Amino acid sequence: MEECKICNLYSLDQSIARKLLESAVYPWEVLPKIKEFIIELGNQLNKDEYEQKGENVWIAKTAKVAPTAYINGPAIIGKDAEIRHCAFIRGNAIIGEGAVVGNSTELKNVILFNKVQVPHYNYVGDSILGYKSHMGAGSITSNVKSDKKLV
């Protein structure tokens, strides 16, 4: 199980969620804590760099958010991130600096490290994607196996 430890999987300096990730050994231990972490961190973000755009939604002033994107909090969208047309952020989402959440991509209870790309027709649920990860079109990650049993 050594290879599954957070310290062996991720470059922690590439996420605003570093403190949360350092509090656990395995990635799945972090998932139930994302919501509270966002709310706590969001209230501490530099107001010169981030705007609060709704209840528990903080968006970096340099981020680009399409007018057709839907963002439900809690959520933090990092500097220079791009939230494209019809992206659906269901809540409990940390989107890293320079990340791309694309057309018709849905996020729920996730941490996307800096420069992650989920550019089109993706579903990312209950997941952590590391620095510079890229998901191809139509890819799905979630906590349900194809046989519908919990992972």
Regions found by a protein language model. Give the residues of each.
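Flexible, glycine/small-residue-enriched loop-and-beta-strand segment within the central core
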Residues: 42, 71-77, 82-151
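Terminal amphipathic alpha-helical/low-complexity segments used for targeting or macromolecular assembly
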Residues: 1-56, 61
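LRR N-terminal entry segment and analogous cap-like coil->beta motifs
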Residues: 64-68
